Regions:
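Short, well-structured alpha-helical segments in soluble
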Residues: 105-117
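Glycine-rich phosphate- or other oxyanion-binding loops that anchor nucleotides, phosphorylated ligands
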Residues: 102
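Catalytic or ion-coupling anion/metal-binding cores of large enzyme and transporter domains
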Residues: 2-62, 69-88, 93, 99, ...
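A short, small-residue-rich loop immediately preceding and capping a beta-strand
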Residues: 114-135, 146-150
Length: 531
């Protein structure tokens, strides 16, 4: 796509507040000057809003004030007028179980913050899972020039010589305690080893996935996704972003120019290549809706099919984001997609050029972290959409984190009516369950458990774990953390609380999962299903 920059100079949006000698203009300038701002900042230069999701209750974002100052430096260097504006910071851990619900509230707040105040362009400082989609949703709705800057992942974790991934090892250690393989005291000892620095999860969880998604969409400078939070190059990225947004305002390069259907195809294929979170499905559909780009669940299945998962990171593989950065980061992965004919190379980015121009010179410096296609974790790594009488509107599964032997499975259902029922019974030694069963949990969707909580990766019962079993087929209308793993069917739709077929499943019914044929079937009669 060829972008034609707007003419410069021209009158900007902010001048509706600041230009001239009217009472309103003097009112606006006067109040701003109480911060010690010189008069020439109001001379028509671009006003850049730095939307900052800093919060000490959001550990992924607790370092963003430093990055905000670096963006500010960059804006000044490019001749702009920077203003730091705090916006709603949604922490996945802090807002459990309703974080998804607050994503939408945050998106609305961001949209109104931009619409209601005197900005010509925005830089969105994001980190934790929901902050990235919420800020991009809000900014896309207003459609002013926008760049995203991620806070970056935390450093690798280590415990007793073992590489430890945030989130992923929380689930593993928790299961080990239930299986009697780890003491509660050791679990607590491992706690500090998981989180050694500021930043988001060091696995390919939802935060790193969404950082990768906005880079693949073209909404960040190239290389944004993987730079560790405490690496000095993260600060450089922020400062360069501050410089770039000023030129974007002058050129009038907006999200609607960048967020095309071709850009979303690039992002969905990137998600397959990195083994990204199932939560990206929900977020990208929402972002596309805000910008008016047609995007469906079927697009996810169609575009991700036959894209190999080449990024060997937890929870699907063995490495962490720090190694991913050293190996070449996301530009190297996008380049590999381009070489395989799986990239819309001329899709526009915030640079003003095509994505291929940004990645064509990228290098892969560790081919055990970024694998060759013939050694991929899975040859078809895209998010799978299964349908059938149990999920007429679809359900999703992440193949890179699933057990191959369970991708074709028929088993007896063990049903939990909701999360409380699950918690009450899962450790009961008399529970009639073994590893061949299919665990089913109802009423955890958007209505049933407001916020569609990340509880779909139900922990296995202790008596199964003690056999050395680490995975079973699990089905729910919930979400799961991007750091989690297993043969887990999620987002089953319609959800149980809306009267979807999931609501009628009973313990003892048989369920068939057939990933290759995209089928999820409840083995009961049509009459029973309708009743």
């Amino acid at each position: 796509m060829t972008f034609k920059p707007a003419k410069w100079p021209r009158k900007l949006r902010s001048q509706e507040w600041f230009a001239g000698t009217s009472k309103d203009a003097i009112y606006h300038r006067s109040w701003m000057k109480n911060q010690g701002l010189p008069a020439d900042l109001f001379d028509g230069r671009p006003v850049i809003g730095i939307l900052n999701t800093f919060s000490e209750l959001n550990p992924c974002n607790a370092h963003l004030n430093d990055l905000a100052e670096r963006v500010k430096h960059g804006v000044y260097e490019a001749g702009g007028f920077p203003v730091i504006v705090p916006v709603f910071s949604v922490s996945e851990s802090g807002f459990r179980p309703t974080a998804m619900m607050f994503r939408n509230l945050a998106a609305m707040a961001v949209e109104e913050t931009i619409r209601g105040q005197q900005m010509d362009g925005v830089v969105c400082l994001v980190g934790c899972d929901k902050t990235t989609p919420s800020l991009l949703m809000g900014a896309a709705s207003v459609d002013l020039p926008t760049i995203m800057v991620s806070g970056g992942p935390m450093l690798n974790g280590y415990y007793r010589g073992e590489r430890v991934g945030s989130g992923t090892h929380l689930w593993k250690f928790s299961e080990a305690v239930k299986a009697g393989e780890m003491t509660a005291e050791e679990f607590v000892e491992a706690e500090a080893s998981m989180s050694r620095s500021p930043g988001s999860c060091n696995t390919m969880g939802t935060a790193s996935t969404m950082a990768s998604m906005v880079e693949a969409l073209g909404m960040t400078l190239s290389g944004n996704a993987a730079i560790p939070a405490v690496d000095s190059r993260r600060r450089v990225m922020a400062q360069l972003t501050g410089r770039r947004i000023v030129q974007m305002v002058k050129d009038d390069l907006k999200p609607s120019d960048i967020l095309t259907r071709q850009a979303f195809q690039n992002a969905i294929r990137t998600n397959a290549a990195i083994g990204g979170s199932t939560n990206a499905v929900i977020h990208l559909l929402a972002i596309a809706g805000r910008i008016g780009v047609p995007l469906t669940l079927n697009d996810w299945d169609d575009w991700g099919r036959n894209v190999p998962t080449v990024v060997n990171l937890m929870p699907s593989g063995k490495y962490l984001m720090e190694e991913f950065f050293y190996a070449g980061g996301l530009p190297a992965v996008i380049k590999r997609l381009g070489e395989a004919g799986l990239l819309n190379k001329d899709a526009l980015t915030v640079s003003g050029g095509g994505v291929w121009d940004e990645v064509k010179d990228a290098r892969i410096d560790n081919d055990d972290v970024i694998l060759p296609a013939d050694k991929a974790l899975t040859q078809s790594g895209g998010i799978v959409v299964v349908k059938g009488n149990l999920a007429p509107d679809g359900a999703v599964l992440k193949p890179s984190a699933a057990t191959p032997a369970l991708m074709q499975h028929r088993g007896r259902a063990v049903v939990f009516e909701d999360i409380d029922d699950y918690k009450a019974r899962i450790e009961d030694e008399t529970l009639d369950i073994d590893e061949t069963c299919v665990m089913v949990m109802k009423n955890c969707g958007p209505r049933g458990y407001p916020g569609m909580a990340e509880v779909g990766n139900m922990g296995l019962p202790p008596k199964v774990l003690r056999k050395g079993i680490t995975d079973m087929v699990r089905i729910s209308d919930a979400r799961m953390s991007g750091t989690a793993y297993g043969t887990v069917v999620l987002h089953t739709s319609p959800e149980a609380a809306r009267g979807g077929p999931l609501a009628v499943v009973r313990s003892g019914d048989f369920i068939e999962l057939d990933v290759a044929n995209r089928r999820l079937h409840l083995d009961i009669s049509e009459e029973e299903l309708k009743s």
